[in-house]
Amino acid sequence: VPFYASDIVHTGGNYMTDGLGIAASTDIVYVENSIPDEDVHSIRQEYYGIETYHVVDDPNNTYIDHIDCWGKYLSTKKVLIREVPDSHPQYDEIEETADYFANSLNAWGEPWELYRVWTPGNQPYTNSLILNEKILVPVTGGSWDDEALAVYEEALPGYDVIGFTGSWESTDALHCRVKGIPDLQMLQIFHNPLNNGTEPDTNGYVVEVLFDDLSQTGLIEDSIKVFWKNPDSDNWDSNILYQSISSQEPDLWTGS
């Protein structure tokens, strides 16, 4: 397996990405590196494929300045930012940061869907881990735990949202302490989400899908389909997806 070392220092708790070329950190990433700020961005692009790198001031204004203490990309189109009462000393900074991410664009050029989680006592609810079909959320035994879990359930229906107690702090919780074990042979699938603002063309709704066959065992072409159904229907329909003929996009498949 080829090994590449990039000349950059980075802490895992200060990095989040959508997996489609967009990432975010606080500006402590500049402080931790002795290279020019623009070189930090260049390395993220050249080594990690990050085309849009949001580097922002830390709204919490704590000693650690890690992004997982106040925010999290939940999916390729949803972002979670903590929320505090207007009496909180960092209220203005946190709201400014929430507005910033709500007005930035996802990989499909659409505004991010913003979700908020109530943290009046600096609860570490954003310091969670999404692992396969589960979301592991640090809880404190306080009165806002159930509401925090409900936010995750609303944002990511179908996931098993589980609260975990522990010796959590506002600057040190679950995401800070665990690591995911990657499946190096997995099949990654990315597609453009359809929503109420998506307009159909003459052949219906166009779906674009990127397949990343990490195992390199090959795709079964006649099994690559898009499935859908209407709310009033019990049966699923399907159409074949077709591979792009462009040599620049060999992993792109489209259909409608």
Language-model segments: what does each one mean?
Residues 1-188:
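The feature marks the mature, well-folded catalytic cores of soluble enzymes
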Residues 183-256:
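Glycan-association/targeting regions that enable binding to alpha-glucans and other polysaccharides
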